[in-house]
């Protein structure tokens, strides 16, 4: 298995076993970074949160399947710029997703998975301006 296929398989396993991770991801995000809750004050129905997670998962999946995600990442970063979301804050969302995925997969999540995720995040961070 390549590093990217570890991510692809992990994401497929989590989706098959647990479905929607929206509640878990945002619970951990706001527990870890309570100050980020203010960024979602106008998200009355959770649509922004669902869209943000869906976009992030699509980026992860595209990367894991060998796709080029540079334009998608740059576009997502740019759309967050108007909300004063720095590249560092933007990248932290992928940390949160990893923590949820690793927790869900428990013993299935190995050092190799962790390294593959770190490599992916390094590639994502490299797209920051």
Report the location of each language-model feature:
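Globin-like tetrapyrrole-binding proteins
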Residues: 1-129
